[in-house]
């Protein structure tokens, strides 16, 4: 996992250069949004169960996926879906705090699509639930933090597509 600071420094180091104006601006932007990201992470942590519950209600609860024969029909499958959504929310929050999506690639997306396909997990419904989670999260953290957080939800959706 990297963060925005490490990414900028590593890029300069690989080239054997000092930080240029563009790199300094990236760091400045990261530091200027630090308090916003920390407040958003605290809000998400305090409301994680509600975010998951509302996301499921918006996207999955009343669809064919929860009816008999659907992919979330048994309690065990439903619990696995809730667990996965919580996992996505947590790691998207970590990525937002770090200002870098690399943790999503390393800990979430690496092999996930293949695993879901082999288990018959409907990727379209998963993406729909993640997008609902993005919407619910934005409504809680506000538009500025929501825009930042949305980048990481979109990154997960893109990786699953």
From Swiss-Prot:
Post-translational modification: Contains one covalently linked phycocyanobilin chromophore.
Claim: Thylakoid is one of the keywords in the record: yes
InterPro entries, A to Z: Allophycocyanin_b (IPR006245), Globin-like_sf (IPR009050), Phycobilisome_asu/bsu (IPR012128), Phycobilisome_asu/bsu_sf (IPR038719)
Residues annotated to bind (2R,3E)-phycocyanobilin: 66, 71, 76, 81-84
Any Gene Ontology CC annotation: phycobilisome
Principal place of residence: plastid
Short name of one Pfam family: Phycobilisome
Annotated signal sequence range: none
Keywords, alphabetical: Antenna complex, Bile pigment, Chloroplast, Chromophore, Electron transport, Membrane, Methylation, Photosynthesis, Phycobilisome, Plastid, Thylakoid, Transport
Membrane topology qualifier: Peripheral membrane protein
Cellular compartments annotated: Plastid, Chloroplast thylakoid membrane
Residue list for modification N4-methylasparagine: 71
Domain of life according to the entry: Eukaryota
GO BP terms, alphabetized: photosynthesis
Other notes: The light-harvesting antenna system in red algae and cyanobacteria is formed of phycobilisomes. These are composed of the phycobiliproteins phycoerythrin (CPE), phycocyanin (CPC) and allophycocyanin (APC). Cyanobacteria also contain phycoerythrocyanin (PCC). The phycobiliproteins all share the same subunit composition and organization with variations in the covalently bound open-chain tetrapyrrole chromophores.
Function: Light-harvesting photosynthetic tetrapyrrole chromophore-protein from the phycobiliprotein complex.
Subunit structure as annotated in this protein's UniProt entry: Heterododecamer of 6 alpha and 6 beta chains. The basic functional unit of phycobiliproteins is a ring-shaped hexamer formed from two back-to-back trimers contacting via the alpha chain subunits. The trimers are composed of alpha/beta subunit heterodimers arranged around a three-fold axis of symmetry. The phycoerythrins also contain a gamma subunit which is located in the center of the hexamer.
Similarity comment text for this entry: Belongs to the phycobiliprotein family.
Annotated NCBIfam families: apcB (TIGR01337)
Protein name: Allophycocyanin beta chain
Record organism: Pyropia yezoensis
